């Protein structure tokens, strides 16, 4: 009886872990996207995922007008290497059974605590951090091609860092340029 109870608790905990990871990603994506129009979001998603905006708008409709679900679907499509129509079919199946995105992970044999689970969780975590930066940059520039590129934003575009000593020299030049610009502004 104890083994049965333990197995039941473990199963419920597993489903909860899947749901929490997916729900957090979707919730945060919806918070990010809630500030912008569909055209802007489709432009950002197009830039990040490389999916045409017209296709993204279809996905938006398919996933219940929820940009968070679209992003998670695209992420899981990449993680599992399956086409988006299949992702949507599995998602729809899970939603109709009240299970949501957890069905996807279970179908592909992802068990909580496994190496595959941690890879998936790390991939979603990285994407989540990337999107935080992308929407932060986009709020400043309103240019989807510039947002989240990990560089210095200038009027003429983005200059990416090169790493190491080159970065230090570049940052020194940027500080010098900013100092000179500040001096000119005070005159």
Labelled PLM ranges:
Residues 1-21:
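Bacterial Sec-dependent N-terminal signal peptides
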Residues 5-7, 19, 136, 155, ...:
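Compositionally biased, low-structure terminal segments
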Residues 68, 182-187:
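Extracellular lectin-like interaction modules
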Residues 10-13, 147, 159-160:
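N-terminal non-cleavable signal-anchor helices
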Residues 21-157:
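Mature extracellular/secreted ectodomains of secretory-pathway proteins
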Residues 139, 161, 165-183:
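Basic, mixed-charge low-complexity alpha-helical segments
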């Amino acid at each position: 009886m104890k083994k049965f109870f333990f197995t039941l608790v473990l199963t419920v905990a597993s489903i909860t872990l899947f749901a929490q990871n997916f729900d957090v990603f979707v919730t945060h994506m919806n918070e990010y996207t809630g500030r912008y129009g569909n055209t802007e979001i489709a432009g950002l998603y197009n830039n990040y995922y490389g999916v045409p905006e017209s296709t993204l708008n279809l996905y938006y409709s398919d996933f219940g007008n929820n940009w968070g679900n679209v992003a998670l679907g695209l992420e899981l499509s990449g993680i599992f290497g399956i086409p988006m129509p299949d992702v949507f079919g599995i998602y729809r199946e899970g939603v109709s059974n009240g299970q949501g995105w957890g069905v996807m992970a279970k179908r592909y044999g992802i068990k909580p605590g496994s190496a595959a689970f941690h890879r998936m969780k790390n991939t979603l975590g990285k994407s989540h951090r990337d999107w935080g930066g992308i929407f932060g940059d986009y709020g400043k520039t309103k240019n989807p091609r510039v947002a989240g590129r990990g560089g210095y934003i200038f009027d003429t575009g983005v200059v990416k860092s090169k790493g190491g000593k080159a970065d230090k020299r570049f940052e020194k030049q940027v500080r010098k340029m900013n100092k000179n610009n500040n001096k000119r502004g005070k005159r």
